[in-house]
Amino acid sequence: HEGLRYGCAAVVAGGEVRGLVPKEKLPTYSIYYEGRTFSRGYPYQLGEHRGVPFGDLIFEFDFGVVAPEVCEDAWTTECPMRRRTYSGAELVVNISGSAFRVGTDQTRREMLITRAGDHQCTLAYVNLVGGNDGLLFDGGGFVFQNGKLMLDAPRWREGWEATTVDLDRTMRLRSENTTWRMDHT
């Protein structure tokens, strides 16, 4: 996009790419060197890439409002999830490439359940599985609705998992939570 290289989540529906959402938080620590290769997305960034919407986007579907994000974007307290849920996103989908380390699965679980509760949303998280350039990715995934575990997908294997969530419940819990309402107005 505009001569720069981004890591993006692509939203595909009805056989068409509906939008590209660039990763905002680029790690440059430990085994991660993304900041050396990629440009980061910015809050409220909007544009097009080859006729496809590009930037800080949320997507409205018949079932609800979806906000995609990429990996590290969920790991900071000032994450894009906060801005996007305050803009109406009910479902946040985080696609991740987090390498395996002992204890990381529990850390992910605790951090993501906190994010889903803090931001009064349903959060679907999926991690890469397999080996790549000497790194090992343990896969797995979670779905949390407003801080409650709805799905714990197995690690170390490819596959599909499904669960049902009630996005009306998410909206009802938001309206009942006076702290959340005050924080975002």
Regions found by a protein language model. Give the residues of each.
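Enzyme catalytic cores with a strong preference for nitrogen-chemistry domains
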Residues: 1-185
